[in-house]
């Protein structure tokens, strides 16, 4: 039995593979909009394991698998043996014998890496403290829909150097664009934590306005991610000057887009004027989680299909 292909961080795929996935996303989304059934994963089963709560991740994967003709089973660690001390490695061997695909949303990247090492089927990272590849997959596809190729473009990341930031930095290496990161002192990017090969595709700025200057895309996330609630008060003070506002958008490129993975806190990491304004594409971004993940699941289970249809 050959080893399954996993999607645990953005750097797991090549630029050519992303080109294929984005082409399939476009084709699959068109089918969806035209109410044309497409069931390449008929009778296949996706198991979704949640340790972290979610709205968009669960909805997009569960609906996506059903739309592809398969079924999705929801597990959380409170209601399964995973929450009662069963070794991750044992759970992986059992769950992967009863399913065709596994998506895990958890805290530590180590958990998903260990699960994948013992899984007989593909494993997808639905989010960890370190990486959020499915979200950046949707973000980049959304940029492509609105502005074309992201190659050679500039992305400004304003806020916490969290899992989203890490994944944007990996994406820049794979797809050849630049990321300008601005964080408060003490929250800077650590290239090794982000899993980077080098520093050629990103730069750090102490001034968020300078990070946004000329950027083609400005993006951010909440200041306090799940699992860091104890730091919330300190973070509110530290990040006060890192709220994406109209001034930051005004120094970006004239056609710059704004993105946020949601849920958002208006008045904290972004003003209502920006997130609800004409440059914001957050609703397209959220919807595209559904379509890119359908293309991702198709690719992981079936390999390259439909190249002629996608072109």
Curated annotation (Swiss-Prot):
The listed locations are:
Cytoplasm
Q: Which reaction does it catalyse?
A: carbamoyl phosphate + L-ornithine = L-citrulline + phosphate + H(+)
Any one Pfam family here would be: OTCace
EC class of the enzyme, as a word: transferase
Is Transmembrane helix among this UniProt entry's keywords? no
Q: Residues that bind L-ornithine, according to the entry?
A: 163, 221, 225-226
- Record: residues binding carbamoyl phosphate: 54-57, 81, 105, 132-135, 261-262, 289
Pathway listed: Amino-acid degradation; L-arginine degradation via ADI pathway; carbamoyl phosphate from L-arginine: step 2/2
Keyword Cytoplasm among record annotations:
yes
Gene Ontology MF terms: amino acid binding; ornithine carbamoyltransferase activity
Q: Name one GO biological process term.
A: arginine biosynthetic process via ornithine
PANTHER family for this protein: ORNITHINE CARBAMOYLTRANSFERASE, MITOCHONDRIAL (PTHR45753), ORNITHINE TRANSCARBAMYLASE, MITOCHONDRIAL (PTHR45753:SF3)
Its family remark reads: Belongs to the aspartate/ornithine carbamoyltransferase superfamily. OTCase family.
Query: What is this protein for, i.e. what is its function?
Result: Reversibly catalyzes the transfer of the carbamoyl group from carbamoyl phosphate (CP) to the N(epsilon) atom of ornithine (ORN) to produce L-citrulline.
Please state what the protein is called: Ornithine carbamoyltransferase
Q: What organism is this sequence from? A: Azoarcus sp. (strain BH72)
